[in-house]
């Protein structure tokens, strides 16, 4: 029976090569392009702060997502210190407050299940299952074998990280704090005064940061460091 298993694996590789040649260069080029990690980060609205000689900053970073990401505060502190800012642990002493929350980290798998190669592999697997004389254990081995091949080529994984950011700056002018509310399913946003908000001498600026990581068979830990670097850079460059 072992001979049949090895023979089937050899035949599967031949089918794989033939199907790949039928697909052409486009799929191969796509795989080659996605073999390296690619991370992009952008802020959906620019924040402009007033110039000030007071360079004290209070930093608060939270993570309410379902994944661990904990190096952002340290990186922001390091970058701002290199720019001449003083980091304080007491918010009442700070001219600037940086308040960030990692709101959501989600994985999206882009699997090309409709392409010719995937169809060929599935069809061949179906033929193997109907080969006389092979027991269930052997079928499981074939299943694992084809699953490894399919996953290695067709799981183009993406991670999306959403970060809410609020930066405030002390001012001599008494101002009211505005809150943002979602009005409908299209997520139109309107500024309305929250009756519970207190007037104070601070200007508040809100925005959102989006980070995208992409690579074939990407695991989050592979992209974590670069995502932290880019989010930290994006926030620090406001100053």
From Swiss-Prot:
Keywords of the record: Cell membrane, Conjugation, Lipoprotein, Membrane, Palmitate, Plasmid, Signal
Protein name: TraT complement resistance protein
Membrane topology summary: Lipid-anchor
Residues carrying lipid (S-diacylglycerol cysteine): 25
Annotated localization: Cell membrane
Protein task: Responsible for preventing unproductive conjugation between bacteria carrying like plasmids.
Keyword Membrane: yes
Cellular component aspect of the GO annotation: outer membrane; plasma membrane
Keyword Calcium: no
Primary subcellular site in the record, as a coarse category: membrane
Residue ranges crossing the lipid bilayer per the database entry: none
Highest taxon listed in the record's lineage: Bacteria
Signal peptide bounds: 1-24
Family of the protein in this entry: Belongs to the TraT lipoprotein family.
PROSITE patterns on file: PROKAR_LIPOPROTEIN
Chain residues carrying a lipid of type N-palmitoyl cysteine: 25
Any Pfam family matching the protein: TraT
């Amino acid at each position: 029976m072992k001979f049949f298993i090895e023979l089937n694996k050899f035949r599967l590789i031949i089918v794989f090569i033939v199907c790949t040649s039928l697909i052409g260069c486009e799929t191969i080029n796509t795989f080659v392009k996605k073999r390296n990690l690619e991370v992009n980060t952008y802020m959906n609205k620019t924040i402009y702060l007033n110039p000030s000689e007071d360079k004290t900053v209070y930093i608060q970073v939270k993570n309410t997502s379902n994944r661990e990401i904990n190096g952002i505060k340290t990186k922001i502190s390091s970058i701002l210190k290199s720019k001449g800012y003083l980091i304080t642990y007491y918010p009442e002493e700070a001219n600037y407050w940086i308040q960030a929350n990692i709101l959501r980290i989600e994985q999206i798998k882009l699997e090309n299940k409709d392409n010719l190669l995937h169809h060929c592999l599935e069809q061949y697997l179906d033929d193997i299952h109907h080969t006389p004389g092979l027991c269930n254990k052997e079928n499981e081995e074939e299943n694992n074998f084809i699953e490894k091949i399919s996953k290695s080529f067709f799981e183009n994984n993406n991670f999306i990280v959403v970060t809410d950011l609020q930066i405030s700056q002390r001012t001599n002018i008494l101002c009211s704090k505005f809150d943002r509310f979602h009005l409908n399913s299209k997520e139109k946003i309107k500024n309305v005064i929250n009756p519970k908000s207190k007037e104070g001498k601070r200007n508040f600026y809100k925005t959102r940061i989006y980070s995208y990581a992409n690579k074939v068979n990407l695991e989050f830990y592979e992209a974590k460091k670069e995502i932290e670097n880019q989010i930290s850079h994006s926030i620090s460059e406001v100053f």
